[in-house]
Amino acid sequence: MEKIDFVLTWVDGSDPDWLAQRREYQPGRGTDAGESRYRDWDNLQYWFRGVEKFAPWVNKIYFVTWGHVPKWLNTAHEKIQIVKHEDFMAPAYLPTFNINSIELNLHRIKGLSEHFVFFNDDMFLIDSVRPEDFFKNGFPCDCCIETALVQDNIRNPFANILMNDAALVNMHYNKKEVIKKQAKKWFSPAYGAMLFRNVLMLPYREFSSFKYSHLPSPFLKATYLKVWDEEGAVLDEVCKNRFRTVFDVNQYVMKYWQYMEGKFTPQSPKLGRFYTIGKHDQQIHHTIRRQACKMICLNDDVNVGDFEKQKKEIQRSFEVIFPEKSSFEM
C-alpha cells in the first residue's frame, strides 16, 4: 500500500512575536482576521494522541507552523517533521496569516508523499481509522455531493470563497460531460439519501457548490500540480493576500478538481461530524465521550460564551478517551 502522510497546520495565537508581526500587516476591508481564527484551545495534544491510538499506520506527520511549536511536543519523534512557512512557501507570500495561502502550497513541502491527508488543528480522530478511510485504489475517498450555495452572514467571506472555487472549475469543465463520464461516482449509494441532492441539481447548467464536511481531506499531490499548472496566476494572486479575503479560493478547489477528473472514491458522509463550539456543546461532548464517529471537527466561533470554561470542558471530554500521553509528547 502507498505511503500516506498527515499534514497539520497550527498557529499559536498567543505568541507575542507572531502577534507583533501580525500587527505590522493590519488587515484591510474585505479581509477576515477575527480573534477566533487564531486563538489556542490548548487541545492539540489530543490530536497527537488520536493519531497514535487510531492511525498508527501513518507514515509521516508534517507539522506546519509559523515557527512556534508547543513546548510539550517531542520534535525528535521519528514521524514528526516540523515545517515552517518559509520552508515551502515563496518569499512573495510571506509572512502570511491566510490559511488559504498555506493550504494552496502544501504540495511544495519537501518529502511529502503523493498521498496525504490535510488536517486543520480543530479536526480530531476519535476512533480507529484505516488507510482505506482516506484512499482506495490510489484515489482519495470523498463525498461528492453538489449543493446550492447559501449565506447567512454578510461578514463571513467563506461563501464567497466557495463560490470562487466553483467558478474556477466551471471555467474548465462542462457539468453535463463530467457527470456523464462519472455517473457511477456521482450517484453512488455510498452517499445514502444525499445522492438525491445530485439529482436535484441536475437541471442547473453549471456547478453551484459542493457539500463541505470540514473534516480531514485526502489529496493527491498530482492534483495540486495540475491546478497550479492550469490556474497558476489565480492561485498566485490568492497567495499574496496576507489575510483571508472574499476574493480567495481555498483547498476545496483541489477537491473539486479531483471530482471533475473522477480521481476520487465515493464515501459515506457519516464518517465524521462537524460541530460549532457554543452552539452544539451537548453533541460535542456526547460524540467525543461515546466515540460516536471516527473523526470530529470542533469549529471555533466568536460566540462561544465563556472561553476558559468551554476549553476546560472540551479537555475533560477528550481525557475520557485519551487519558495517557502519546509518544509525541515529552
PLM regions and their residue ranges:
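ER/Golgi luminal nucleotide-sugar-dependent glycosyltransferases, focusing on the catalytic module
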Residues: M1-V117, F124-M330
